């Protein structure tokens, strides 16, 4: 009984911290999530700065271009309403990290996962540690995340070919709330990068930024 009471107390304490801090920082906060396992969490170094600049221009946000990098197990994740995770391969969350991320999501936080190719099997395994009661479900094309400032009637845009599969947007929904959006076979982050990095067309670059802006607006307007 004591263990359950202690867990509840910690959860509500984290919830209070999240809401208290997010009210003060929500206008200028997106964080890159650093994780273990070797799956290059640091991929796409120009992607978030470019997305933030685009949002500041198109959505009139006031986001800090010099975004923070936060470890999964850090209490600092509760300062940021939106976390971004990317990479190509293995992802490993310790049990403490999984619990920390779970508390963050249940307290109102949001996680965007962007498969930079090769992330799928690992992130699905690790997110089961975080929300074992939830499965990734493909979001319908009429979901509000595709219809913010920019309309994507067919869901995620295809930015990079990879396995030539259709891009899919998956979600983890906890008690009716979308807490995690997972962009798969799309590679939004590569599309956000400086054009010369991947030699993307201007059209793909803009489409990727527009979809990213939709995610940001969806999170900040919830």
Q: What residues fall within each predicted segment?
A:
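Short alpha-beta junction capping motif
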Residues: 30, 82-121
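Bacterial N-terminal signal peptides
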Residues: 11-20
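An acidic, glycine-rich "communication" segment
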Residues: 27-29, 34-38, 46-47, 120-196, ...
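Surface-exposed patches in mature extracellular/periplasmic domains of secreted proteins
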Residues: 62-70, 113-116, 134-141
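Bacterial N-terminal signal peptides that target proteins for export
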Residues: 1-12
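Aromatic-Pro/Gly-enriched surface loop or interdomain linker
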Residues: 24-82, 86-89, 179, 187-188, ...
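Alpha-helical scaffolding within the catalytic cores
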Residues: 65-72, 94-99, 164-168
